[in-house]
């Protein structure tokens, strides 16, 4: 780029701003990066750093933008751009966060950054948008925990399913999947007991009945009630028969 080779920082900066205002993000970023070292330690340093990071953000290069914005907020904590920078930093992780079927590490990072922003800037114009995003990302974590547990259930690994489902409830007690998770715990416990060797069935049916009573108490009007009632009756019948056999010995 001839302009960058000109050695005229004011001209380069002026052209970078022109591209920036015209939303030509790639061209603006190239010039901001090329002129940055000229203004190191000057009052213009934070502006150039912010504009360049925003160019990356607008170009949807969220990985690079997040790195630049993190550097910016650490270095220029008192800048006039700090609120915007921290908002964009949080949003980078939001846009990098994948759907619930994939690893949710980025979602966790997004939630941390978003909650930090809301705590720091409770009166921000962006606060309502961030609240909405916070709800969406939290739901994504609930979905992930549910899907992980359901996968074990679906492939017939009922012991693992029970553990995973209980962990999902423990981790996210307010989950929108709570009813379905508690139902699956009952169902998986019933199947696990039914498929167990005789000497372990009694304890496992008793554990299943505990899960059943918890489910019925919390969701007495559930669409699954008839089904879990049937399972519970089968478990009780087994326990009664077993008790009679023990008494006859």
What is each model feature region?
Residues 1-249:
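Acidic, polar-rich low-complexity tracts and alpha-helical solenoid repeat scaffolds
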